[in-house]
Amino acid sequence: MLAFLLDKHERSFYFVGMTKGEDTKLTVLEAGLDMASQLGLECVTIGNLAKTTNLSKSGLFAHFQSKENLQIEILNYAAQSFSESVIIPALKTEAGIPRIRALIDNWIRWSYELTGGCIFVSASADFSDRPGKVRDVLLHQQKEWIDCLRRIAQSAVQVGDFRQDIDDDQFAFDLYSLLLGFHLYYKLLDDAETRKHQETALVRLLDSYK
């Protein structure tokens, strides 16, 4: 499967048939994702999540054991949400440019729905120079996402929407750079013309690979 699809054990945790404890943990992860989106993943702690969710600090510690484990669980939960909201729906769209456009629209919608925007963007800035397990998880997720962009470019070649000699690594770089630029203009600069500029840049990008 493509990027961000969790393994069988992880998927079973987040879906149906959860125990009361697992349901509580899911509630905490949802609150943690929202907090990480607004304040940054580094600001999410067992203590402040306990206050936000009105749960005991000792109860949350029993679930996560450490701040690092909590942050990793939030990243895994975010990855599952990203897969369900962005990647899987796009893969159900016609291969080629329609699929690329669906992926971009889904990414933008998913980022809109998070108060502070894409958690992977903010977490990458926070942890890029901080070795450790959280960075390792984030790095793996981002590499899978970039590989997903490569694969979608390859599928566009296969259906004839892109020319045969494209560099799919360059395409992944170009498309992700476009999305990161969109995120900056929309979230920080609050530019009303962001979506218009994004569409213009996307058309130019797609045309360059035809």
Language-model region placement:
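Amphipathic alpha-helical segments used for helix-helix packing
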Residues: 112-133
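Hydrophobic alpha-helical segments that form the core
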Residues: 166-185, 201-205
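Alpha-helical structural segments
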Residues: 26-34, 38, 51-52, 69-92, ...
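Helix-turn-helix/winged-helix DNA-binding modules
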Residues: 38-41, 62, 163
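All-alpha amphipathic helical-bundle segments outside canonical DNA-binding/catalytic cores
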Residues: 136-140, 158-174
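Short hydrophobic/aromatic patch on the recognition helix
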Residues: 53-64
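C-terminal peripheral helix-coil segments that are non-catalytic and often amphipathic
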Residues: 1-18, 102-106, 110, 146-159, ...
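Basic, helix-initiating cap at the start of DNA-binding domains
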Residues: 1-39, 43-55, 69
